[in-house]
Amino acid sequence: GNTKIRKVVDNGANRIITDYAGNGNWGDRDGSALAEAELGNLRNIVVDSNDNLYVTAEQRIRKISADGSTVSTIAGQWSDFADGYGTNAKFRTPEGLAIDAEDNIYVSDRENNRIRKISELTSPNGAKVETISGSGEYDYQDGTFDQAAYRDPIAVIYGAGALYVVDRDDNRIRKVQISPKMTIPAGQTSVTYNIKSINDIVYETDEIIEFSSNLVVGGILASTDPISLILKSDELIPN
């Protein structure tokens, strides 16, 4: 292919197409967008709230600055699996990309059979990469984030606090709930939950406490008495 990002401008009479990033060579070099940057094996693209572009290319997640001047690598280095920051993180054929309102990026990591989350995009150590779903086994299995299994997840889209994954070899669309909620029933002042199974809890919007990492961030309770919340595991769910 041309290994380039192209820009299309519709002026009403014509569509004007120009090169935006990539010098046409197959590779992984960062640098000035048109003269130096190499964008081999381009797959997908998303745009953040500041108009920066992010693409999957050559086992990496690459960023094209909003002004179109530079290309940099925010995560990934070579084909493998590892969570971490910047180039310490590794992917195997990152394919689909999605982005939420807080500029967290989600990646369907095909050959690792996992769904990855990229956050802290401006960190000096590189963006943070963590696995939010998938055991890595080539299999079909529903369950909590480290129990679920995929067979070749090739695309992902974000909507209303959930990810929807095209699980190609399973011929299914899978849902990953990334904003879990816990319910304290009306009139009840004590509740016990196992963090590992929180995704399976049915909830209603008028009686919820949202749990993100180790922080209870809100809730509207039917009871006016003090609430006791007991968690049975110290293993944290992903953000």
Q: What residue spans do the PLM features occupy?
A:
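Short loop/turn segments immediately following the C-termini of beta-strands
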Residues: 1, 10, 58, 110, ...
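Structural signal for beta-propeller blades
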Residues: 2-6, 61-62, 113-116, 171-174
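Short loop/turn segments immediately following beta-strands, especially the blade-tip
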Residues: 8-13, 65, 118-124, 178
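Gly/Pro-rich loop segments of beta-rich domains
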Residues: 12-41, 68-95, 123-154
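Residue-level detector of Asp-centered blade-edge/turn motifs that repeat once per structural unit
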Residues: 47-50, 99-102, 158-161
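Conserved beta-propeller blade signature
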Residues: 52-55, 104-107, 162-165
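Blade-level signature of beta-propeller repeat domains, shared across WD40, Kelch, NHL, RCC1
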Residues: 152-179
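Short boundary segments that mark the start of a structured unit
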Residues: 177-239
